[in-house]
Amino acid sequence: MSRICELTGKGRQVGHNVSHANNKTKRTFLPNLQNVTLISDSLGKGVKLRVSTHGLRSVEHVGGLDNWLLKTSDDLLSLRARRLKRDIAKKQQAVAA
């Protein structure tokens, strides 16, 4: 399972541990990923995603999963999230028509 947020695209970063003597050793910084079930208002069901805590706060700030997906560009989203975005857009167009 990859260590990448499905909504924001945040992945691991590489840096150094720096000792008191300024010795540097390589290390990785992993995103704080959580397995969560987010509710889609348009689809009326829950969707299981692997999301970073930063992404979770962003989704809540925008007003829910549907708003987040429709406002976010496709290049940041995972394949599952892009499919979900397409389904939500279709459902909203059907309701509007």
Swiss-Prot record:
TM ranges: none
Entries under InterPro entries matching the protein: Ribosomal_bL28, Ribosomal_bL28/bL31-like_sf, Ribosomal_bL28_bact-type, Ribosomal_bL28_sf
Keyword list, A-Z: Ribonucleoprotein, Ribosomal protein
Gene Ontology annotations of biological process type: translation
Protein family (similarity comment): Belongs to the bacterial ribosomal protein bL28 family.
Superkingdom of source: Bacteria
Pfam families: Ribosomal_L28
Disulphides: none
HAMAP family noted in UniProt: Ribosomal_bL28 (MF_00373)
A cellular component annotation (GO) from this entry: cytosolic large ribosomal subunit
GO molecular function: structural constituent of ribosome
Full protein name: Large ribosomal subunit protein bL28
SUPFAM superfamilies: L28p-like
Gene, per the UniProt record: rpmB
